[in-house]
C-alpha cells in the first residue's frame, strides 16, 4: 500500500473528500484482479504493466468512516486462482479543534491611556502544550503558544497599538493541529481614544452672581462632547 491521504491520517477536511487507495503488487501480472476492502465496502481494480494499482473511494464512503484506526485490506488473485492479502492501517481523526479569544483591555475598548500601552491578546484552546496559535490584528500576525492548560497569550507592542485608528478592529486567532484539523476564532475591539470635552454655559446668565441670584440658588449647566450616554460628570469647586 502507498500512504493514504499523504500521511495515513484522514483529518476533518479529508473526511469529506474522495480518496485514492493505491499500491504495488510485486510479481503480479497485468490484469491480475485486486479487491480492496474498507469496512463493509469492497472496490475492485486490476494490476497495470508496472505492477501498480489504484482505486478511488467516493467521498460518501470516506465520510462514513468513524474516528479511530481503519484497516484496509487488498487481496490479489492471479489467473491460476492463487491469492494473497496485505493490510494497511489508516487513522481517521476528525476531532474538533477549539479556540477562543478573551476580552481585550478589560472591556473590549482601547481608550486614550491604553492606546499608548502594550496590548495583551489571550485566549484558550484544547490543543496540547506548545501548539502554535497565529493571531492577527490590523493585518499584522503575532505568534503565541499554548501552555499545559491550553491557555495562550501574546503582547502587541505599544507602537502597533498607537498606530490603530479610531475604529472597530477584529482580532483573528487560528490554529491547526498535528493532523491538519484547524479552527479560527474572532473577537472585536473598539479603539476610542478621543478625550471628552466639557463646555460650561454662562453661569447666572452673565457669569456674575448678584445678591438676588445668590439667594435664589443657581444651576451649573454645560455640554460634554466625545462622551456616551450615562457617562458621569463631576463638579469641582475652585476658590471660596
Task: Set out the residue ranges of the language-model regions.
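Flexible, low-complexity linkers/stalks enriched in Thr/Pro that connect modular domains
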Residues: 1-4, 78, 84-102, 177, ...
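Short, solvent-exposed loop/linker segments at the N-terminal edge
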Residues: 7-17, 107-117, 206-216
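Aromatic/hydrophobic beta-strand junction motif of beta-rich domains
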Residues: 21-25, 121-125, 218-224
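Short proline/glycine-enriched turn/loop motifs at strand-loop junctions of beta-rich domains
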Residues: 25-31, 125-131, 225-231
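Short strand-edge motifs at loop-to-beta-strand transitions and within beta-strands
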Residues: 51-55, 150-154
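Surface-exposed, short loops/turns at beta-strand junctions within beta-sandwich domains
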Residues: 59-69, 158-168
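Hydrophobic/tyrosine-rich beta-strand signature of extracellular beta-sandwich/beta-rich modules
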Residues: 70-74, 171-173
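Conserved small/polar residues in nucleotide/adenosyl-binding loops
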Residues: 235-240
Amino acid at each position: 500500500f502507498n500512504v493514504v491521504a499523504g500521511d495515513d491520517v484522514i483529518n476533518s477536511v479529508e473526511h469529506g473528500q474522495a480518496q485514492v487507495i493505491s499500491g504495488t503488487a510485486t510479481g503480479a501480472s497485468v490484469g491480475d484482479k485486486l479487491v480492496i476492502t474498507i469496512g463493509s465496502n469492497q472496490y475492485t481494480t486490476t494490476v497495470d504493466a508496472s505492477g501498480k494499482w489504484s482505486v478511488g473511494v467516493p467521498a460518501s464512503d470516506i465520510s462514513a468512516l468513524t474516528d479511530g484506526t481503519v484497516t484496509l485490506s487488498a487481496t490479489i488473485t492471479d489467473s491460476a486462482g492463487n491469492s494473497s492479502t496485505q493490510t494497511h492501517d489508516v487513522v481517521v481523526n476528525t476531532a474538533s479543534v477549539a479556540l477562543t479569544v478573551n476580552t481585550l483591555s478589560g472591556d473590549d475598548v482601547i481608550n486614550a491611556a491604553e492606546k499608548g500601552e502594550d496590548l495583551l491578546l489571550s485566549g484558550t484552546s484544547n490543543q496540547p502544550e506548545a501548539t502554535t496559535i497565529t493571531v492577527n490584528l490590523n493585518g499584522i500576525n503575532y505568534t503565541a503558544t499554548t501552555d499545559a492548560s491550553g491557555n495562550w497569550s501574546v503582547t502587541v507592542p505599544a507602537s502597533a497599538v498607537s498606530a490603530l485608528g479610531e475604529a472597530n478592529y477584529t482580532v483573528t486567532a487560528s490554529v491547526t493541529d498535528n493532523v491538519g484539523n484547524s479552527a479560527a476564532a474572532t473577537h472585536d475591539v473598539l479603539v476610542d481614544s478621543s478625550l471628552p470635552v466639557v463646555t460650561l454655559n454662562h453661569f447666572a446668565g452673565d457669569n456674575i452672581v448678584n445678591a438676588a441670584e445668590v439667594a435664589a440658588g443657581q444651576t451649573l449647566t454645560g455640554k460634554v462632547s466625545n462622551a456616551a450616554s450615562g457617562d458621569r460628570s463631576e463638579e469641582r469647586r475652585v476658590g471660596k
